[in-house]
Amino acid sequence: MAVKWIAHIFNSRVIGISIDEQSRGTVELGEHTITADWVIAGDGADSAIRKGLGIAFDGMTYPERFLVISTTQDLTELIPDLAGVNNISDAEEWLVLLRTPRHWRALFPVDGTADAALLTSEAAVQARMQRVAPLPVGYPISHVTLYNVHQRVASQFRLGHVLFVGDAAHINNPLGGMGMNSGIHDAVAAADALASALDGDVSALETYAQTRRSTALDFVQAATHRNWEQLQERDETVRLEREARIRATAADPVAAREYLMTSTMLAARPTDRGSDVS
């Protein structure tokens, strides 16, 4: 397959799409319009292409919002044995601490109806971080983000010559880090399916749509929601039973490998022509 040309158009927002009789898509990008035989829509959770084609995006919104605080303070200086990613289950307030290249990031669940200005104020942010680990001089805060959290999947991942990938196709809570990774899997599988279609195997497109949607529903949505349920569990008996299961899994090489294959998404990685391995 020869690529005739590639063009990058930056600082443009997708406004909409129209489909002609030959199934070609014309994508509107503000000052630009592009007509193509095939379209891979990766324009995010608010996908103008998905909405323009009338594809449903069903699911649910969590009752709480997530508050993310980024600091340049090295948390390993304050908390011994801290890992790069830490899911902290607590009967009063769960949280996530994770290392990024330039920051430590703390994620907290907060009241979905509380005033956003109060939640993100300097005093409130410092108070939350001080509960994580006391720091008398205060935390250097790089940025604060407050957002709603959803679990949603498009009713179809393909409409004619349009394929959907990433957040345009499915969104989930960030617990487990599966959102971006599954979106990358989508892109790999969609590119492979499109290459097959251009070589004459159009059935690869439907295989892509069905397998990636099933993966989003049965694997990503299920795993991330389970992570949320486990972190916010308050029943001490249930919490202790889960800890015992985790320790038993870690002590069993076969069970540990199976667990890691799932949690790292290797068990759901795309293979040739959009299919998945189990």
Name the predicted role of every residue range:
Residues 2-15:
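A conserved beta-strand/loop element that lines the FAD pocket in flavoprotein oxidoreductases
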Residues 12-15, 24-26, 38, 42-145, ...:
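Conserved FAD-binding catalytic core of PHBH/FMO-like flavoproteins
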Residues 18-25, 158:
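A short, glycine/Asx- and small/polar-enriched loop/turn
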Residues 19-22, 50, 173-174:
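Short N-terminal helix/helix-N-cap motif within the alpha/beta-hydrolase-1
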Residues 29-38, 42, 159:
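Core beta-strand elements of the Rossmann-like FAD/NAD(P) dinucleotide-binding domain
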Residues 41, 141, 147-221:
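Conserved mid-domain beta->alpha element of the FAD-binding
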Residues 123-130, 140, 144, 152-163, ...:
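Conserved flavin/dinucleotide-binding core of flavoenzymes
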Residues 193-278:
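C-terminal helical "tail/cap" subdomain of flavin- and related membrane-associated enzymes
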